[in-house]
Amino acid sequence: MSSLRPEEARKLATAASVSPLSNCQFCGVVISSIADEQKLEFTNKYKGSCTLLCSYDSQGVVLRVVSDDDRSHVLKEYMITADTDAAQMGRRSYAVSLDADNLVLRFGSEQDQQLFRKVVENVKHLRPKSVFSQRTEESSASQYFQFYGYLSQQQNMMQDYVRTSTYQRAILGNAVDFQDKIVLDVGAGSGILSFFAVQAGAAKVYAIEASNMAQYAQQLVESNNVQHKISVIPGKIEEIELPEKVDVIISEPMGYMLYNERMLETYLHARKWLKPQGKMYPTHGDLHIAPFSDESLYSEQYNKANFWYQSAFHGVDLTTLHKEGMKEYFRQPIVDTFDIRICMAKSVRHVCDFLNDKEDDLHLISIPLEFHILQTGICHGLAFWFDVEFSGSSQNVWLSTSPTAPLTHWYQVRCLLPMPIFIKQGQTLTGRVLLEANRRQSYDVTIDLHIEGTLISSSNTLDLKNPYFRYTGAPVQAPPGTSTQSPSEQYWTQVDTQGSRNSSSMLNGGLSVNGIGDGMDITHGLMHPH
């Protein structure tokens, strides 16, 4: 699609007017401050006229003031939000309260004043209606979009070879779903998935990104000469308007334990733009849950909390905080990886259907548990990982974060019990995991476990927003007690076997190089020097 048809251009213009305007600039603006409110006396705040630069931000619109004579230096920066007080004054002036400043902006033309007024009104009009804003604290949203606005964080995700390559294979391997199709990329970030869609033959991709990463995505689009294919739209999917319905929605909405960050709700919300029988990549997600035994991990957290059990720390008694310290450490989910042999039973699978589940279904997720214990030991908590499937017309592709699969930047998550429970092979462990969404873009995770036929039970509530990142990069160790033969004898047997092979190779006229026989024949060089 080399250019937009008139009707499409009209719709895009409408979308721009509905969504918060971005990248607007107004030249020749005289900025005055109100010196005396009763007498309505004004004084010029800056010498000469200024240029106002407006750019979309997750919290509203950033307004930067620069001099008309020197635009390289920002004189002042303000934030226009839903709470900003503003009013029109005549045909070319606009009064606005920004931070502690009561300003009057006199524009160079009536058209500029009307456009600036629309910028302010759009912010005030849209934010109260936003589903995202209703479910998210402003401080959490600000930190979230700031985090994903860093190139280093985008690089961290892009360099996850398993993640990025699986997405590319799923999209290119199902090119029939993308060829000449309209695609929506939700939470586009750098736009890498949008580029994959274009590689698969997409006619048009709308890349929606709410963080400042949108400007970098636009740079990549322009430098790769695909601006006729990819339209980067700054904003949240809950707030923007598209000019048309789409055939496919692509996104990478998964967080730790699948649901963290509550991006899945945004992904499901985007279905309002999906045509009937449209595709979603990925199509569904499976959360796996299994009981595990890991005395080392439990002791590590327990001993950290025991710092607060000191009665003479530099002469200060800390013991009054021991209980709260213990509670805080055990409220932290552990993000790392492990040998799957620590799992004491087959995992329970909870499915999230991205094509049919509703946003509200993710506000309170109750997962019943029933485990048939395969090995006797102490259950220290529950382990979580997830798989997602891309169900395409040509092939199905899976992305897995299982401990048996190659490691990804999601790792796995473990939730500890403050009071572990001893359980025997053949017993049944039942219970429930309850994920309760909060306005910090995460979940409170409550675990309740009970050994059937006994009075033994244990529970805990954890804060998924505050995990402990334990992964060190060291190789995963097998759980204790899994060796069925002497490891020492196994090693020396291998050494003896390798030595016998090397000796045999030498006797047969060859030279062993790094354990590989017949590496080279040096006899010719020794007997026939040049």
Swiss-Prot record:
What is the enzyme's class at the highest EC level? transferase
Q: Which InterPro entries match?
A: Arg_MeTrfase, PH-like_dom_sf, PRMT_dom, SAM-dependent_MTases_sf
Q: Identify the SUPFAM superfamilies for this entry.
A: S-adenosyl-L-methionine-dependent methyltransferases
Would you name any one GO CC term? cytosol
> What PROSITE patterns does this protein's entry cite?
SAM_MT_PRMT
An MF annotation (GO) of this entry: protein-arginine omega-N monomethyltransferase activity
How would you describe the post-translational modification of this protein?
The dimethylated protein is the major form.
Methyltransferase found in the keyword field: yes
What this protein catalyses is:
L-arginyl-[protein] + 2 S-adenosyl-L-methionine = N(omega),N(omega)-dimethyl-L-arginyl-[protein] + 2 S-adenosyl-L-homocysteine + 2 H(+)
Mind telling me which PANTHER family this protein's record contains?
HISTONE-ARGININE METHYLTRANSFERASE CARMER-RELATED, PROTEIN ARGININE N-METHYLTRANSFERASE
- Protein name (record): Histone-arginine methyltransferase CARMER
The organism is Drosophila sechellia
